[in-house]
Amino acid sequence: MAELPGQIRHIGGRMSQLLEQIYGFSRRSLFRVISMGPIPCHIAFIMDGNRRYAKKCGLLDGSGHKAGFSALMSMLQYCYELGIKYVTIYAFSIDNFRRKPEEVESVMDLMLEKIKSLLEKESIVHQYGIRVYFIGNLALLNDQVRAAAEKVMKATAKNSRVVLLICIAYNSTDEIVQAVKKSCINKSDNIEASNYKHEDSDSDIEGTDMENQEKKIQLVDIEENMQMSVAPNPDILIRSSGETRLSNFLLWQTGNTQLCSPAALWPEIGLRHLLWAILNFQRNHSYLEKRKKQL
């Protein structure tokens, strides 16, 4: 009789594995059906509702963010199984630094822990061969978090199968301002180099229209200097908790993006919310493609 509890645990473990295998098979079969239609190349997420989830469930401060990380890992798995190459997440806004210092410190500690975990052998990064980018003003992060982020980017630089972009210490206004600044600096350097070349050749000929045009900052100059230029513009943007605001996230890149706002708080988000967003994208795909050609 003493062996009975152990036997029960063993049977329970086998049943759990069996159910997990059945669920995985069913999920992959469903994905094959969904893949008969157009699959988005890039999905972005605003992970909203972690704090409200903790309050709703009576959890301690910070527990909502931990539950949100678990939801993120599941969502990344679904996206990569579906063949979605680029996933962008809004992890921490520049505006979030205005929150209570103890809350910011708690979030940064959790981020440091999770960023380091990305390099573990059993992590999703190694499982799917993910290249990781950290997008944002990393100078605003503390030394430990910034160093960990840079280490992950360096360690995954040769991965090319799928891409994860983590927006941290980010907002769209800052990204645009920095891109304009870089464009001005680059254009100024190019003009100085061009003037030096003309002086060296003793040429008094005025610049051609093309040369004068090259002195002006073009749209392409700004776009090339955007941090998000490493990925195509998002096809779908999902914001949890039912909010329809972009909250200064990817404003430059989402002019032709399908928006989806499920009512679920981020830790509650699941496969059905992702599939519903993709089905809506497929339904509107021809219109979205037509709009892209017009831009």
Swiss-Prot record:
It is an enzyme of class 2 (transferase). GO terms for cellular component: endoplasmic reticulum. GO terms for biological process: protein glycosylation. PROSITE patterns: UPP_SYNTHASE. SUPFAM superfamilies: Undecaprenyl diphosphate synthase (SSF64005). Catalyzes cis-prenyl chain elongation to produce the polyprenyl backbone of dolichol, a glycosyl carrier-lipid required for the biosynthesis of several classes of glycoprotein. This is Dehydrodolichyl diphosphate synthase 6.
